[in-house]
C-alpha cells in the first residue's frame, strides 16, 4: 500500500500557492487578474 499523497501543511501551502508568490511573477499577477475578473471570493491560498 502506498501512502496518501496529500499531507496538509499550511506553511508549504502558502509558500507554493500564496498571494505573495503570485504577486512575485508576471504570470502570477495574470492569474490574480483573471480570478478578480471572474469574481472569485478567494484569490489565493
UniProtKB/Swiss-Prot annotation:
Keyword Ribonucleoprotein among record annotations: yes
Xref: PROSITE patterns: RIBOSOMAL_L34
Keywords in alphabetical order: Ribonucleoprotein, Ribosomal protein
An example molecular function term from Gene Ontology annotations: structural constituent of ribosome
InterPro entries cross-referenced by the UniProt entry: Ribosomal_bL34 (IPR000271), Ribosomal_bL34_CS (IPR020939)
Keyword Ribonucleoprotein attached: yes
GO biological-process terms attached to the record: translation
Superkingdom, natural source: Bacteria
GO cellular component: ribonucleoprotein complex; ribosome
Similarity comment: Belongs to the bacterial ribosomal protein bL34 family.
Name of the protein in question: Large ribosomal subunit protein bL34
Organism for this UniProt entry: Streptomyces bikiniensis
